[in-house]
Amino acid sequence: QADLWRKGLADWGQAPERIARLKKAADFTVYTPGSNAGTPVNILRNFAPPPPALQQDRDLLRERIQTTATSLLALLGLDADPITSREHILLSNIFDVSWAQNQGLDLAGLIRAVQDPPFERIGVMDLESFFPSKDRFQLAMRFNNLLAAPGFEAWLEGDPLDVGRFLYTAEGKPRASIFTISHLSDTERMFFVAMLLNEILGWVRTQPGTSSLRAIVYMDEIF
């Protein structure tokens, strides 16, 4: 089998010496979100405010908020429409207000904010008319059950969702970050991919212009 792989690499012009130079020049890390099989990714411990450059672009900020709310509700099995779903509208307003105050939210903080939102009105309606407290409690319970589910702690461990750390080590060595999500359910895969791409877009928006290639994002086996 080793000979087969060696021949295949050689057919693509990848000699052993070239591969050895790559291995020496870069760090390779395999990330396994939601699992400790590789390096876990801490994706749910804190929903930090986007960088200032992204916050100043209302269209991008709105997209970040909607994607975050949609992805979280999908984890609960809720196919929430941003326009008609009161759950989606509530979460979107919570993130909008918190991030405007430059405050991050961990999952526990989000649960508390669902029960006691940092505002009294949504649109022109008072909060209790739009989303009564007993119904908000049910939504908070669903998030709490998710947090308490066996194995869920793996989503709260490991390296933070930080694009800079995915590209370079602490010593400045280039890093090839490989994310494997084959062990996740379809819903969990979509959640992780959405959150990762959100972070990448936010990182891109903070970078100054350049004519040099900074990073490559490659996605394999998309169905």
What is each residue range found by the language model?
Residues 3-223:
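P-loop NTPase motor domains
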